[in-house]
A protein has these predicted regions:
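Short, solvent-exposed amphipathic alpha-helical segments in soluble enzyme
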Residues: 38-42, 69-71
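A sequence-composition feature that detects small, non-aromatic residues
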Residues: 1, 38-40, 88
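C-terminal tail/extension regions appended to the core domain(s) of diverse proteins
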Residues: 48-124
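Generic recognition of flexible, low-complexity loop/linker segments
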Residues: 9-10, 41
Length: 124
């Protein structure tokens, strides 16, 4: 989180703005996914630059439910499994990918409108 000092009247307050948020779950079912989607939306309403990840061992949500259009940036299913009874190994490549995404985000320039104007594409 990034600490921000705000002043309201004569009073100064320090607030924390999330830069990266990671929810960790042993398994992810539909109810937990819905809660994570709501949390991601709340966090991103305060800081749209925040990355929001869910990390779970197994993904136990029906295949008809697709969270791709939610505010969650990625769901990492470390065992690449939909069944918590199977003991597939945790995939270390996924952990490294998550680490690198967080590291790159923390070191990135969040806003470069002038550079985007030069490219001709303002949003992406």
């Amino acid at each position: 989180a990034k600490k921000i000092v705000i002043e309201i009247g004569n009073e100064k307050k320090i607030i924390n703005i999330p830069i990266v948020s990671i929810e960790n779950k042993t398994y992810l079912d539909k109810t937990m996914l819905e809660g994570s989607i709501a949390t991601a939306s709340k966090i991103k309403s305060g800081n749209p630059y925040c990355l929001f990840f869910v990390v779970c061992e197994t993904y136990e949500v029906s295949k008809e439910t697709d969270p791709v259009y939610s505010d969650i940036d990625e769901i990492y299913c470390l065992r690449k499994s939909t069944d918590s009874k199977r003991s597939a190994p945790i995939n270390s490549d996924l952990i490294l990918e998550l680490f690198n995404k967080v590291k790159n985000h923390l070191n990135s320039t969040w806003s470069d409108v002038e550079g985007k104007i030069e490219s001709g594409k303002i949003i992406g």
